[in-house]
């Protein structure tokens, strides 16, 4: 079983030595009601994106099912669900199967769900071609028209082979074709009654490339090389070309079918579906410059999801903020946005990442409010030390044993009981961030990951309300 994406615990750790090279963040308050609204006046602005990552492995130990998104009301407040993750093989192809640590077809499309765990209350049968998460996502879309589901490729653990897979034009074409065949066309490997040609057709509405990171060191064993930057640009171009070509072929097939049924006269030709193309991208300017030709890439991306968390992690010797809106001479949401804009990214294609978890330290000394103080190590937690879900941290805050501290000027919060500290985002912090998104004319918000929220989807709701207030 894949573990939770602990990737995001180590991103900042890899790059902390580089933090001094980052340009200073803006002082707090810049852009807040001070003429910071960059949207053109008099034009209707497209709806803000509210994106959540759904983890493939969360259905096991965490028992977080697709149906939980329906019963909590979360699905109705999301625009996109990114399914994490699809893997790329050593042969340079998208693939699935039942291979521990590499693929989990059982969770994806083979596992039967009973009526109680099914989005529409109907249990899976032994003979249907599609079951598992993919079938539940299909049902979730039926209940929530307009909701898009994207397959996210890679992640911290599964970015191993990207660099090798994109070295030539032929290898890029083969990789992209394999991903479209598996996820967009839905041609799943046969697994007993499950799978087959077109079994998952219509489940996915686009592709999210989560290569961590082109041109930069990341997880142990992940290949990277200097030419990743140009190859990544070419890969994204190939995804856009092949997705558009497939959409046009679908539209032609529909037109031919309508014509064959005598509906061809007096009817408009079907408009090709637009498949979204996005990526998860780093906050560290060194990583941006090493792997991302921003101006060229953004022509093909519909949007990118900015790293808005793990600015500091529990493996560090001192406590610090992990997701501040502003920070001086440090990583922050505002600094990340400005670094991408400075390199040519349109503001209306930038989605701000938000955590549904906290980073925590124990053995904190030095007194005061705990922030910026020495610690002995990561705080004990439910699934991995130093990393705890918001739903658990909320209970700590409500218990009275921890005090909630806020830096309202810089937009972040933390819990401290005298020895243990957790830095996290709560609804109050998210309200400040949604105001920032609106003021700056950004594209919206993204959550890593949906299983960390409360049972009633408190964080997703806060962002939905903040982005869509009138």
Segments from the language model and where they lie:
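Secretory targeting and sorting signals
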Residues: 1-29
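Extracellular low-complexity, Gly/Ser/Thr-rich intrinsically disordered linkers
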Residues: 27, 395-470
């Amino acid at each position: 079983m894949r573990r939770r994406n602990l990737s995001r615990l180590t991103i900042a750790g890899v790059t902390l030595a580089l933090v001094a090279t980052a340009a200073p963040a803006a002082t707090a308050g810049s852009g807040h009601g001070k003429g910071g609204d960059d949207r053109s006046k008099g034009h209707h602005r497209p709806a803000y994106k509210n994106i959540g990552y759904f983890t493939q492995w969360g259905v096991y130990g965490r028992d977080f099912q697709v149906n939980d998104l329906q019963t909590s009301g979360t699905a109705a407040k999301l625009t996109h669900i990114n399914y994490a993750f699809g893997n790329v093989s050593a042969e340079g192809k998208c693939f699935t199967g039942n291979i521990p640590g590499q693929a989990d077809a059982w969770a994806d499309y083979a596992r039967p769900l009973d009526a109680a765990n099914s989005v529409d209350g109907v249990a899976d049968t032994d003979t249907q071609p599609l079951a598992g998460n993919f079938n539940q996502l299909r049902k979730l879309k039926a209940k929530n028209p307009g909701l898009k589901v994207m397959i996210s490729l890679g992640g911290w653990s599964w970015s191993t082979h990207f660099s090798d897979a994109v070295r030539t034009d032929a290898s890029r074409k083969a990789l992209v074709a394999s991903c479209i065949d598996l996820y967009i066309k839905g041609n799943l490997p046969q697994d007993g009654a499950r799978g087959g040609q077109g079994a998952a057709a219509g489940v996915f509405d686009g592709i999210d490339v989560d290569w961590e990171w082109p041109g930069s060191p990341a997880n142990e064993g992940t290949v990277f090389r200097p030419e990743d930057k140009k190859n990544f640009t070419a890969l994204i171009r190939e995804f856009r070309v092949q997705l558009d070509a497939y959409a046009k072929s679908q539209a032609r097939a529909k037109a031919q079918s309508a014509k064959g049924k005598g509906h061809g006269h007096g009817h408009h030709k079907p408009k090709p579906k637009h498949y979204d193309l996005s990526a998860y991208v780093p906050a560290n300017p060194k990583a941006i410059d090493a792997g991302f030709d921003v101006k060229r890439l953004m022509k093909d991306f519909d949007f990118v999801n900015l790293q808005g968390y793990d600015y500091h992690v529990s493996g560090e010797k001192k406590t610090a903020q992990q997701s501040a809106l502003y920070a001086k001479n440090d990583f922050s949401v505002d600094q990340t946005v400005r670094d991408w804009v400075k390199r040519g990214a349109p503001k209306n294609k930038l989605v701000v990442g938000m955590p549904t978890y906290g980073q925590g330290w124990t053995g904190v000394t030095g007194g005061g409010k705990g922030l910026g103080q020495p610690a002995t190590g990561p705080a004990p937690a439910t699934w991995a030390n130093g990393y705890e879900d918001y739903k658990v941290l909320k209970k700590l805050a409500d218990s009275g044993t921890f005090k909630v501290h806020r830096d309202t000027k810089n937009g972040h919060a933390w819990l401290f009981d005298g020895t243990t500290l957790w830095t996290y985002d709560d609804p109050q912090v998210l309200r400040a961030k949604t105001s920032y998104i609106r003021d700056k004319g950004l594209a919206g918000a993204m959550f890593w990951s949906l299983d960390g929220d409360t049972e009633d989807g408190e964080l997703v709701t806060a962002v939905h309300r903040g982005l869509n207030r009138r």
